[in-house]
Structures are given as structure tokens and as C-alpha cells.
């Protein structure tokens, strides 16, 4: 086997669909803001990486906590911590001491209500904003990713309701519901 004889398209296609760009590459959902054309497709597929092994969220969270500490030392201010997708899981676990707020863009989930992460965020008084893009409510019913993203968004809404009821400050922004359409998982 040579590298030239392998076809990686099926795996790429799964992410294209899961990230709600379109049903099948190179098709885009109607109204999509994802750029048209071969060059855009090429760049999208280039960002795919192979499985590089286990991912230790605790190590990543501790490292980012050190970065937040350094930022506060250098600036005198806590940071607004922005996460996206799988990075959301890391963000919920970063030590809260040096974080002013969290902005989570389509995190793959939220902390379980009552969990250590939930309690840490609530106790620290960290305000949270969670954003979701388009093609969740209007995505194809026969694609598993559509129901996955609905469940993630519904979980975020439940998290926000309880976080707010417990005295926290969490807002979930569903971009299409405020008139901002055409955004996929990448916004």
C-alpha cells in the first residue's frame, strides 16, 4: 500500500456532515455561509488530523489554568475564556481562579448539574455564554448528527436553567432564533 492508494474521503465526509456544513460534500445547506468552491473544500479537509492517541483533559485543563494565571499576572485582569467544540470539555475543567467568564461555542456538552465542575463554576460566580449555530432545528431528520446537536443544545438549555436558578448567570444563544442564520458548527 502506498499513501497514494488510500482514500480518506469517507472519514472526511463524516465530519463535513457532523459539523453541519452540508449533507454530502461539496453540497452546502441552503443559506450556508461556508464558502463555496473547491478551494474552501480543500482547506476544510486539510484541518482534519489523524487520531494522535489519548487526550488527557486534566493535563490540558491544568496547562490552560497556568496560562490563565500568567495572563492575570501580566495584565492584572482575569481572562474571558473562549472554548469551541471538544475544547468545551477542557474549559469546564480549567481552574476558575483566573477566569472572568466563559464563552462556549457549541461545546460537546456541559457539566452535569451538581458535579464538581458545575459547583466550581457556580461558586466562583463565573458568567457563561453558550452559542449554537444553524442547521440544528432545520437539519435533515435522517442524519444522526442532527439529533446529536439537538441533544447537546437541549442539555445546554437545561444546564443554563439550573445554573441560573442556583444563582449563576448563564445565557444560551441560538443564533438562528435571533436572526443570524447560515452558521455551521464553526460559526
What do these predicted regions represent?
Residues 1-30, 137-149:
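Short, surface-exposed "cap/lid" segments of acyl-processing enzymes
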Residues 57-79:
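Conserved acidic catalytic loop of the alpha/beta-hydrolase fold
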Residues 170-187:
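C-terminal catalytic histidine-bearing segment of alpha/beta-hydrolase fold enzymes
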Residues 82-91:
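Gly/Ala-rich beta-loop-alpha elbow adjacent to hydrolase catalytic centers
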Residues 101-175:
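The feature captures the conserved acid-bearing segment of alpha/beta-hydrolase catalytic domains
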Residues 81-82, 102:
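Conserved alpha/beta-hydrolase fold motif
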Residues 94-95:
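Aromatic pocket-lining residues of Rossmann-like dinucleotide-binding sites
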Residues 40-56:
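Short glycine/proline- and acidic residue-enriched helix-loop micro-motifs
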